[in-house]
Amino acid sequence: MVQETNGRKTGLLASLDWWTIAIYVALLIFGWVSVCGASYTFGDTDIFSLSTRSGMQIVWMATSIILGFVILMLDDRFYDTFSYVIYGVLLLLLFATIFNPHEIKGSRSWLVLGPIHVQPAEFAKFATALAVAKFMSTYGFDMQNWKHFAAALSIVVLPMLFIVAQKETGSALVYLSFFLMFYREGMPGGILFTGVAMILYFVIGIKYEQVLLWDTPTSLGKFAVLLMVQIFSAGMVYDYCKDKAKALQIASVSIGITLVFLLFSKFVIPFDIVWIQIGISILLIGYLLYHSLYTRMRNYFYILIFAIGSIAFFYSADFVLNNVMEPHQRVRINVLLGLDEDLAGAGYNVHQSEIAIGSGGLKGKGFLNGTQTKLKFVPEQDTDFIFCTVGEEEGFVGAAGVLLLFLALILRLIKLAERQPFSFGRIYGYCVLSIFLFHVFINVGMVLGLTPVIGIPLPFFSYGGSSLWGFTILLFIFLRIDASRNFTN
C-alpha cells in the first residue's frame, strides 16, 4: 500500500502539466513587477517592505504557491466528492456578506475579519465550477433536456444573484462566461446567438437612438434593430427549419417593403417608418405562429419567441438603462458608447489609462519610470487598471508579451480540457478557461476603452490576496484533476 502511494505521488509529478505551471509562474512574476510599478512612489526606498503593496504582494504570491502545492497533494476524488459541500459553504458566505455592515468603495462584497479582508465572490467561482461540473457529469444528464439545462443554469445564477445583492454587478457578470462551457457541452447555439443579438440591440439601439436616418424623422437605432430582428428571424428559419424558400420570402418582403417606404419618406412625405417596421414585425410574428401551428414544428415556435423577445428587449433597454442601472453604471455606458465624454468624471479612469498606455510607446519607459502611474493620475492603477502600468513601463512589446502569455494559458487549458477521460474534468476545465478568458478580455478591454468599466481584476496581476488565491485555486484544482488522468481506472 505504501509502495502504491509512493508510486502514485511519483507518477503525479510526472503527470503534472509543467507548461501550465511555468506560464502561471511567469504571470506571477510579471504581475509582481507591474504591482511594483503601479504602487511605487518617489519616496519609497524598499519595494520588498511589507509596508508597501509590492511587499505584501510577495506574501500573497508565496501563500498562493503554498496553496497550490496543498491542492496538488490532495486526492483528486476529493474535489468531485465534496463539490456540493464546497459550493454550499461559499453560498452561505455570499449570503452572509449581503448583510455585512462594512462597505468598501460602495460594495458589501468583503468580509472583514480584523485586519484581514476577504472577498468570497472570488472563491465562489471555483466552487460554482465544481458544482456545475459535478451536476452535469452525473449519469443521465442531457443538455438538450430543458429541465436538466435549467437546473445546471440555476447553479450558476444563484451566486450571481447574491453577488448582485452585494452591489458587485461586475463580479456577477463573470458568471456569464459559463455559457461558453454550456455551449461546448451541447447547449443549442441559438441561445448563445440570442445573447449576442441582445447585446447588439442594446448597443446599436441606445447609441443611435437620437440619430436620424437619411434626413427622415426615423431613429436610426430603432430602424437598425427592427431590421436586424427580421433578418435574424429569416436566417433562423433557414438554419433551424431548413426552409430556404420561406427564409428568402421573409427577408425579401421585410427588406423590400421597408426600402419602399424609406424612399417614400425621403422623397414624398416624411414620416417615421419605424411604425411600418412594427407592422411588418407583427405580420412576421403571425406568419411564424401560423407555421408553428400548421407544421407542428417546435423550431418555428422558438423563432417566434425569439422575435417577440427581441422586440420586447429592445423597447425595454431604454427603461433598464434609465431606471434599473445605478447612476454610475449608466454614466459609464454612455461614456463607452460615446454619448457622453465626461473626461473629468466617469471617463477619467479610461482616459488616463489610455494616456499611460500611449505614452509607453514601443518599448516603454522602463521599470519604475512610468510618470502617469507614479503621479497617481490613474485611479485603481494597481488593481483593476494595472494593465495600463504594463503598457506605460514595458510599452507595446511588454503589453503584447503579457497578452501572448494569457493566450498561451487559454490554449493550453483547452488542450488539457479536451484530453480529460471523464466529463467532470472536461466540464470543470472549460469553466476555468472561460473564466480566465472573460477576465482578460473585459479587463484589458476596459483599460483600452473598448468595454464597460465593471471593476474586475486581471488574473495574477491585480493587487490583492483574494483575487490571487481565487485564481490559483481555480487553476490548480484543474491541474490536479488533469494529473490524475493516468491513474483512473
Residue map of PLM features:
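Hydrophobic alpha-helical transmembrane segments of multi-pass inner membrane proteins, especially
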Residues: 25-34, 41-43, 47-344, 388-446, ...
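A juxtamembrane structural motif centered on a specific transmembrane helix
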Residues: 1-7, 233-238, 249-261, 443-489
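Long extracytoplasmic/lumenal interhelical loops at the membrane interface
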Residues: 354-357, 361-394
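Glycine/serine-rich anion-binding loops at beta->alpha junctions
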Residues: 115-124, 166-167, 361, 453-472
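N-terminal membrane topogenic signal
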Residues: 7-24, 54
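Helix-boundary and loop/linker segments of multi-pass membrane transporters
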Residues: 12-14, 149, 375-378, 420-421
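Transmembrane helix boundary and interhelical junction motifs in multipass membrane proteins
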Residues: 168-173, 364-370, 381-383, 454, ...
